[in-house]
Each structure stands twice: as structure tokens, then as C-alpha cells.
Amino acid sequence: MPRLLGWNGARIQGRVRELLNIFQLDPGAYAAKFPHQLSGGQQQRVGVARAFAAEPAVLLMDEPFGALDPIIRAKAQDDLRDIQRRFGTTIVLVTHDIDEAFRLGDRVAVMSQGRVLQYDRPAALLICPSDPFISRLTGTGDRAMKLLSLTTAGEAAEAGPAEGATVPASATLRDVLSDLLWSGAAVVTVIDAAGTPCGRLTLAGILAHGRPR
């Protein structure tokens, strides 16, 4: 695509190196490799990198992670989210996995039989579904856990003294709750990317985030 847009060789090579570095693939080791020489996860990262090669303003992705195992899939989803935030690209992603839609989407459009039933933020789809189909799709048995997965520890951190184990600010409240239940603790300290405490979370505070407001 960059060649079709008239990019010169130097610009193309620079973009290739930039994207490989962003996706944690050393250009010296991977730039000349063929797809069959890469692992499944590496192939997926290269595929996403190629989609960003021409600096598109809007990117359409149809079930991009459906064939990956859960661990590689989660990493690929995290990579896509980080890259989207870095470049500011608008991504329209089609998926049949509501958890994936909630994990990646700022807004989610739920469609059935060719009609858009609701277009809203993930939390609104959980708390105020406009149609019985959406209620069935989002599930009723684990709504609280889905709601907790939409908020990070950094977003929910409360002021207070550092106490207990530490959790990264990027962790979801669902993950933090799981850790607290497993350890039997009632409070954890939230740390930023540099390892600096930026607040704390209590079990009671997390549970409050799992209820509609």
C-alpha cells in the first residue's frame, strides 16, 4: 500500500522499522523473514503492523483474532489497543465475542438480523440494555465481573497509605478482585509504570464498582 501511495524507498523502510519496533520485533532479526518462519503470535503482530503501514485514518478489522489461542489473543488485543492510542487511528472491529468488544471498544454497536439494536459504551450495554437480545448477549450471571473488567486500578485508586501487595495501574478491577480473593487480603497498593505508588484499592471499594451507579 505505501508503494501505491507513492512513498519512496527510504520512507517505506523507515516505516517498516518503526512498526517492527513498536510490535517488539527486532528489525534486524525479523525484517527479512517470511511468514512461515514466524510463530503464530509473530504472524499476527506482523499482520496488524501491515494494516497500519500506510498510516490509515480509519481501519476495518473483521474477526482479526479469532484463530489465536487465548494467551496470544490477549497479547494481540493489548498490542492493538496500545497502537490505536499511539496513532489515534479509528478502528472499526467486527467480532462475535462480546468480551472482546468490551475489552477493545470505546463504543459497541450490537447488531441482530441486519439491525443496530444499541450503540453505546460497554458499561451502558451492561447496565441499561435496550433489548432482551442484548441482555442475553452480555449475560446476567457475570455482569458484575464484566463491569469490573472495564475499569483499571489506576482509574479507581483511592487516596491512602501504601499497604499490602502492589498491583499495576493498568490491571483491571476484575483482576485485582481475583488477587484479593485468592490471597485473602483486603487492600492493595496501586503503582504506576515507574513503580511509584499512586493510591490504593480496598475490597469494599472494588465491590462498589461492580454495581450499577
Residue positions per predicted region:
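Conserved catalytic motifs of ABC-family nucleotide-binding domains
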Residues: 55
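Catalytic Walker B motif of ABC-type/P-loop ATPase nucleotide-binding domains
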Residues: 59-62
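Hydrophobic anchor residue at the start of the ABC signature
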Residues: 48
